[in-house]
Swiss-Prot record:
This is Rhodopsin. The gene is RHO. It is a multi-pass membrane protein. It comes from Globicephala melas. InterPro entries: GPCR_opsins, GPCR_Rhodpsn, GPCR_Rhodpsn_7TM, Opsin, Retinal_BS, Rhodopsin, Rhodopsin_N. CDD domains: 7tmA_MWS_opsin. It is found in: Membrane; Cell projection, Cilium, Photoreceptor outer segment.
Length: 348
């Protein structure tokens, strides 16, 4: 084995020379240079400085403006809540541990940090699944006489949290475990060892199939059908120009969010899958650290995409930031009708 396994950790460094120490007790400078730990700390600080204001402001503006509290906006708000979980439960912890070059909070802190990071990532993934299903139902109209309403939106929210908990909670109760990963300053699922006493391999397979592959299949199916339907409706002019424009805008926004999610999370999932299928192989700590920390940027890009592509939210946000005055004027407020119209599409 080219790594060193302990009771609650796996360090990707051979202990032939006797230099490996517990990542819960000693700095891990034998894994990387001090400046590299400083870079990680600076990156986490940047995520906190950018992630908290963007996501908090999204929630605050929605509370302030009643016209934003529509069923189709529930899931993007859910994303903001999940991102704040990651900021407070994960990023602040990792910032502190990176400054010390080891996970100073011990196994219990590792469980909490790994739980919040996994929970936030899975809520984001399942939120995109629900968004895809919502857009598919509203635009493609597979069920006639269906009107998307608040109850459906609440059911979607519940699904995201139930599925996210089904992925993040088991390692806390004995099915797999959370351990420090990469440079040992943040924690995640144990992809590195078989660990028979916690049935580690079965959990990793379950997670990859149920909480990664199946959601992506659903997303691609829904958007494949959606793109086909929008193009067909536009060609046949079956709907009003206003409705078609609204559907295209919202669809474009969600597709960009999905692509951005894949760019951030597929590298992490791919590296994790490689490590899982090549346990004991030789790889450096940076091999897992870079995809892991890159994936954390999802807490920033999702709200940015939503704000930039949702004219109504952007208009309300500018009004809030500018103390009740919108420097762009009220022209964009006219998008309210087009945005909400898609939630009450008439039967096909």
């Amino acid at each position: 084995m080219n790594g060193t396994e302990g009771l609650n950790f796996y360090v990707p460094f051979s202990n032939k020379t006797g230099v490996v120490r517990s990542p819960f007790e000693y700095p891990q400078y034998y894994l990387a240079e001090p400046w590299q730990f400083s870079v990680l700390a600076a990156y986490m600080f940047l995520l906190i400085v950018l992630g908290f204001p963007i996501n908090f402001l999204t929630l605050y503006v929605t509370v302030q403006h009643k016209k934003l509290r529509t069923p189709l906006n529930y899931i993007p708000l859910n994303l903001a809540v999940a991102n704040l979980f990651m900021v407070f439960g994960g990023f602040t912890t990792t910032l502190y541990t990176s400054l010390h070059a080891y996970f100073v909070f011990g196994p219990t802190g590792c469980n909490l940090e790994g739980f919040f990071a996994t929970l936030g990532g899975e809520i984001a993934l399942w939120s995109l699944v629900v968004l895809a299903i919502e857009r598919y139902v509203v635009v493609c109209k597979p069920m006639s006489n269906f009107r998307f309403g608040e109850n459906h939106a609440i059911m979607g929210l519940a699904l995201t949290w139930v599925m996210a908990m089904a992925c993040a909670a088991p390692p806390l109760v004995g099915w797999s475990r959370y351990i420090p990963e990469g440079m040992q300053c943040s924690c995640g699922i144990d992809y590195y060892t078989s660990r028979q006493e916690v049935n580690n391999e079965s959990f990793v397979i379950y997670m990859f199939v149920v909480h990664f592959t199946i959601p992506l299949v659903i997303i691609f199916f829904c958007y494949g059908q959606l793109v086909f339907t929008v193009k067909e409706a536009a060609a046949q002019q079956q709907e009003s120009a206003t409705t078609q424009k609204a559907e295209k805008e919202v669809t474009r926004m969600v597709i960009i969010m999905v692509v951005a999610f894949l760019i951030c999370w597929v590298p992490y999932a791919s590296v994790a899958f490689y490590i899982f299928t090549h346990q004991g192989s030789d790889f450096g700590p940076i091999f897992m650290t870079i995809p892991s920390f890159f994936a954390k940027s999802s807490s920033i890009y999702n709200p940015v995409i939503y704000i930039m592509m949702n004219k109504q939210l952007r208009n309300c946000m500018l009004t809030t930031l500018c103390c009740g005055r919108n420097p762009l004027g009220d022209d964009e407020a006219s998008t309210t009708a087009s945005k909400t119209e898609t939630s009450q599409v008439a039967p096909a």
